[in-house]
Structure formats: structure tokens, C-alpha cells
């Protein structure tokens, strides 16, 4: 495969998180680069999906104006892909168990938390296969080959 692909187009993949459990109390997304990893931790009840954008000038509306080219993006969401709130309210993914909107009330305060971390990883660290709690102030990342790295983070803040 090659990227960027077709000029004037954007592609988007929506990945749905599994529900939180006692053993896995958060959902995560990770990207590994040479010597470090960026990862995001979230409550999947608040952000049930993650969008992976492959932007190459396909969004003509402001503020992009088809100038957003050769870019990759990751966005935690509660939405119907990148569609409008009106379309998300139709709850078209309900039969798959994926909420696309959330009700808010002026009388009920809501906090939506997302933790983003950059941490060092050992040489040769590959595709992240798991991020799990390691006590209350750290997480352990495991790659596809069984290599591990620990990152200090108060994941309980989620």
C-alpha cells in the first residue's frame, strides 16, 4: 500500500472499543514510532469508538479547504463516523451495540476524560497488542513479540 493515496479524497476507519471490565478498565489506542509510543486511554462508555483519518485533501469545507493533505489522524469519538450530529442522532449503529450519541442534561454535570501519553519503549518494540493497568499509577504495554514497557500514568483519573 501507499500513502497518501488518491488526491482530493479522505478515507476513514471507525474502530469500536470493547466495554470496560474489571481487568481492563479502559480502552486504548496506540501508535509506535522509533523509540517511543503515543497512546490514548479512555472510558469506552464516553468514547465508544476511535476514528482513524487518512486525509488527502478530501474535505473542502472550512477550515480544511482541501489543504489538509498527506495527514493521518486519530480521534476518540461518540459519533456516527465523521457524520453530522443529526445523522448520529438516528442511532444507525444501535443494532451493533455502538452508541453514536449521548444525552446531556443541564442539571447533571458530566466530565469526559481522555489521557494521552508519550513514553519511551525498548529498541525493536513493535505493534502494541495490550495496555493494562500496572497498579494505580502505571500501565504496562505489551507488543506483538511479548516485549513490554511500563509508563507512569494515573489511569484511575478516567
Where do the PLM segments sit?
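Short, surface-exposed, polar/charged, turn-prone segments marking secondary-structure boundaries
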Residues: 58-59, 100-105, 131-132, 139-143
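Generic low-polarity alpha-helical segments
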Residues: 31, 114-116, 139-140
Amino acid at each position: 500500500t501507499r500513502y497518501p493515496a488518491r488526491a482530493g479524497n479522505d478515507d476513514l476507519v471507525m474502530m469500536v472499543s470493547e466495554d470496560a471490565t474489571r481487568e481492563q478498565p479502559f480502552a486504548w489506542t496506540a501508535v509506535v514510532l522509533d523509540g517511543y509510543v503515543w497512546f490514548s486511554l479512555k472510558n469506552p462508555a464516553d468514547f465508544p469508538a476511535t476514528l482513524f483519518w487518512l486525509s488527502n485533501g478530501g474535505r473542502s469545507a472550512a477550515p480544511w479547504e482541501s489543504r489538509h493533505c498527506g495527514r493521518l489522524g486519530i480521534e476518540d469519538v461518540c459519533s456516527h463516523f465523521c457524520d453530522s450530529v443529526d445523522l448520529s442522532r438516528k442511532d444507525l449503529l444501535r443494532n451493533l451495540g455502538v452508541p453514536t450519541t449521548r444525552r446531556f442534561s443541564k442539571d447533571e454535570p458530566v466530565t469526559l476524560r481522555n489521557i494521552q501519553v508519550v513514553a519511551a519503549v525498548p529498541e525493536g518494540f513493535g505493534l502494541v497488542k495490550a495496555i493494562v493497568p500496572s497498579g494505580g499509577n502505571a500501565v504496562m504495554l505489551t507488543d506483538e513479540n511479548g516485549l513490554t514497557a511500563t509508563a507512569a500514568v494515573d489511569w484511575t483519573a478516567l
